[in-house]
């Protein structure tokens, strides 16, 4: 039986691990990130992949850095025939890449060579793409640059956010892996080199990318809001206070108002002018220190009115 070591960390990785188990491979170990403090109370929380592994009685390793010699030796002691990774979060050292007889393969959430890096799902929406997908490729010491083994496309709906697209890609990745691993073991694949000239990157989201710039077009802002939902969430300011924007709708609303101006207060939320004729109806918001709420609840309690401006530290007189 083929001995597999699986490496992954977040929710995206769980269906991938589960598929390997259900397909009957001998998963001899799981490598994941260390437990991290989570939430306001900073409770030490295990990664989702660790929880899944323990449910199946699979040994778990949690190295801070898998490149350290003693950590490499722990993985090699498991004698893997194949290493499979999915959103592990670390680049593997050469000693690990060269060890398994069937190599090391990675399940990546984009159509490589586009969107290499740690946040491909976010960027596919931020950039307004209509489709993305899964690529399974051999791992090399360079980020997401190995030869491609298999691909599948996944449509991005106009209403998708990072959460919904993540779930679709996670399922697609598990299915593609199930179809791909037997071919890798049998040697019946023809890996395709990536075209470096077409490579684009999706580095982890930075804080400045979360701030809404109302001078951008309505379409760009709409994509930014859904491309940061459910994490880390786009924000603006109102009366000097941060205001998270979870969801919006595009509204055709030609106006001479400055970008960021509240042009109307509706039952469903507030309509805000942008840098073009597509305004945004903000339908889910979260004022500082409060819970996420529907636009209608925000309107009832926020004392916001037409003419107010978002995105500046404006205090009402």
Swiss-Prot record:
Catalysed reaction, written as an equation: L-methionyl-tRNA(fMet) + (6R)-10-formyltetrahydrofolate = N-formyl-L-methionyl-tRNA(fMet) + (6S)-5,6,7,8-tetrahydrofolate + H(+)
KW Protein biosynthesis (keyword) present: yes
EC number in record: 2.1.2.9
Disulfide bonds: none
Pfam families: Formyl_trans_C, Formyl_trans_N
UniProt key word Protein biosynthesis: yes
EC top class named in words: transferase
Keywords (A to Z) from UniProt: Protein biosynthesis, Transferase
Gene Ontology biological process terms in this record: conversion of methionyl-tRNA to N-formyl-methionyl-tRNA
Superkingdom, taxonomy of origin: Bacteria
Residues given in the record as (6S)-5,6,7,8-tetrahydrofolate binding sites: 110-113
Any one GO CC term of the record: cytosol
Molecular-function annotations in GO: methionyl-tRNA formyltransferase activity
NCBIfam families (UniProt xref): fmt
Family listed: Belongs to the Fmt family.
UniProt-listed PANTHER family: METHIONYL-TRNA FORMYLTRANSFERASE, METHIONYL-TRNA FORMYLTRANSFERASE, MITOCHONDRIAL
Free-text function comment from the UniProt entry: Attaches a formyl group to the free amino group of methionyl-tRNA(fMet). The formyl group appears to play a dual role in the initiator identity of N-formylmethionyl-tRNA by promoting its recognition by IF2 and preventing the misappropriation of this tRNA by the elongation apparatus.
The protein, known as: Methionyl-tRNA formyltransferase
Gene name as annotated: fmt
């Amino acid at each position: 039986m083929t001995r597999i070591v699986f490496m992954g960390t977040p929710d995206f990785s769980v269906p991938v691990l589960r598929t390997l188990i259900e397909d009957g491979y001998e998963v001899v170990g799981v490598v994941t990130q260390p437990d991290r403090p989570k939430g306001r109370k900073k409770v030490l929380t295990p990664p989702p992949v660790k929880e899944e592994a323990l449910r199946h009685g699979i040994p778990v390793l949690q190295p801070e850095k898998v490149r350290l010699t003693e950590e490499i030796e722990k993985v090699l002691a498991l004698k893997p025939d194949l290493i499979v990774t999915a959103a592990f979060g670390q680049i593997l050292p050469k000693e690990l890449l060269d060890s398994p007889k069937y190599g090391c393969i990675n399940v990546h959430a984009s159509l490589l060579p586009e969107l290499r890096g740690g946040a491909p799902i976010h960027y596919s929406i931020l950039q307004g793409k209509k489709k993305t997908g899964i690529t399974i490729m051999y791992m090399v010491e360079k980020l997401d640059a190995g030869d491609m083994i298999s691909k599948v496309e996944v449509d991005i709906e106009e209403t998708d956010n990072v959460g919904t697209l993540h779930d679709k890609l996670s399922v697609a990745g598990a299915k593609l892996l199930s179809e791909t691993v037997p071919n890798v073991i049998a040697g019946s694949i023809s890996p395709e080199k990536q075209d470096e000239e077409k490579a684009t990157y999706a580095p982890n989201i930075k804080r400045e990318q979360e701030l809404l710039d109302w001078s951008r077009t309505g379409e760009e802002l709409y994509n930014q809001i859904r491309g940061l939902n459910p994490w880390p969430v786009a924000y603006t300011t109102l009366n000097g206070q941060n205001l998270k924007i979870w969801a919006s709708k595009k509204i055709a609303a030609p106006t001479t108002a400055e970008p960021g101006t509240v042009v109307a207060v509706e039952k469903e939320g507030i309509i805000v002018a942008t840098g073009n004729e597509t305004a945004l109806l903000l339908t889910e918001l979260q004022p500082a220190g409060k819970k996420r709420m529907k636009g209608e609840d925000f309107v009832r309690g926020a004392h916001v009115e037409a003419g107010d401006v978002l995105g500046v530290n404006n205090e009402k007189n």
